[in-house]
């Protein structure tokens, strides 16, 4: 079996994402999968996992090769908190279980990519701060955090990664541009793995703003 490039996507599904925002995310994800399937490098290496989090955290898609991937339904509750800390702990459990670290005889998977999207701030801040320490004990090629919409707070995300981006609006065209950019990140990861430990992020589109 060829070495996999695990891609973990964490999506905030708290009550405020209900309606157009989550529907737009679904369209963006669907377009991303379709684009990646057309890329021979991505098709050979990329495996996608989707974890949703609100009051509960669920891995709605375990790490799956693109050719076998069917996007599951993503549902938001009518209301509820954003347990980002619980989501990060859950992610680390999935990483420990799913990512092949390799052995002296056999190379393991490439270091995963992590994309986290939220439209708010962690409701479980103490858990979140502890979970960040745990995430940093795991190796990722890149961690990208996206703060979507006017109520999203970037300060907590900056503790997790330097790669924090904002989306000013939460409409379908903005999410589409964001997921097109995620697609390019995954494609680039598939091509540059083994050449360098950390890949440079491609330039984002105008709708996706880097937080300095």
Q: Model-found features: residue ranges?
A:
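Short glycine-/polar-rich loops that comprise or flank the Walker A/P-loop
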Residues: 4-5, 111, 139-142, 161-163
